Amino acid sequence: MDKKALSYLSISQKAGLVVTGEGACEKAISSGQAKLVIIASDASDNTKKKFSNKSDYYKIPNVVWGLRDEISRAIGKNNRPVAVIIDKGLADRILLFLRE
């Protein structure tokens, strides 16, 4: 797990730029508000497929990365297999760290 990416995820949450929860994430994606979809690698296959397909359809970058517990801890919430970043700059920064 990339510590810099986790730090930026935490900063994004503190700035109010992370959407979590299945319904809220779906709404953010379909409304065009989402800039990056992060899906935990230990999320269910159904969740991975659902959010991967939805973000692909709306042409929003998505990444299967990290564990549910690590993502949840970074954003200060329990049991969050999906997180949506709604700020382009922070989304780009997180993707940059993940690609290093």
Q: Residue ranges of each PLM-predicted region?
A:
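Absolute protein N-terminus
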Residues: M1-D2, E100
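N-terminal first-folded block
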Residues: D2-I39
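Solvent-exposed alpha-helical segments within well-ordered globular domains of core cellular machineries
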Residues: S7, G23, K27-S30, K49-N53, ...
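Structural motif
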Residues: G16-L17, K35-L36, P61-V63, R80-A83
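Short, ordered loop/turn segments at secondary-structure junctions
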Residues: G23, D42-A43, L67-E70, K88
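N-terminal positively charged helical leader segments and presequences
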Residues: S30-N53, K59-P61
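Mid-chain, well-packed structural core segment of small domains
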Residues: S52-R80
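C-terminal structural segments of small proteins and small subunits
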Residues: D69-E100
